[in-house]
């Protein structure tokens, strides 16, 4: 098995961006553990972790967007603009659903989940459309992204309905699930 075979600059951007997103999830998870543990003062480490999550997340989006944009010029698959429009439409549908139907305060996590899902699906689409991923790998990764996004949305909707301890654990589920999906994505891309 050969890793990183014929990697071009756009492939490295997508790989590095996903790696940074994995680090972002881990920093965010560390912040969550430190800041929201029941009966805990939080401590000063929380500020470091959330800052690191923000920086790695923004850098990841920039890198992945560059790689996706470059590859989309040659992609014969689903155009990325349809994925982005679908993600934006879903976000704007879920804003009132979240507030009106579920009576849940809208927080930045709703936007973060949509950005993550659209970014990952866009990467899968261009990697499939350029022939880097076969249909099996593309469908598997897209399904994992979909499952992780739906799990995150369910946890998001339930968060304020749970007691302190349950909501603490509930908040870790999307971060852990997304980190797992990104680790799988990195492994699949490395050997493709």
Predicted regions and their residues:
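Juxtamembrane boundary at the C-terminal end of a transmembrane helix
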Residues: 183-192
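Non-cytosolic membrane-interface motifs at loop->transmembrane helix junctions
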Residues: 42-47, 106-112, 137-139, 166-173
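N-terminal topogenic module of multi-pass integral membrane proteins
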Residues: 1-77
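C-terminal ends of transmembrane helices
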Residues: 64-72, 97-104, 157-163
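Structural signature of hydrophobic alpha-helical transmembrane segments
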Residues: 50-56, 82-86, 140-147
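Small-residue-rich transmembrane alpha-helices that serve as helix-helix interface/gating elements
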Residues: 171-183
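Membrane-helix boundary connector in multi-pass membrane proteins
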Residues: 129-139, 151-170
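Membrane-proximal helix-loop-helix units in multi-pass membrane proteins
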Residues: 89-147
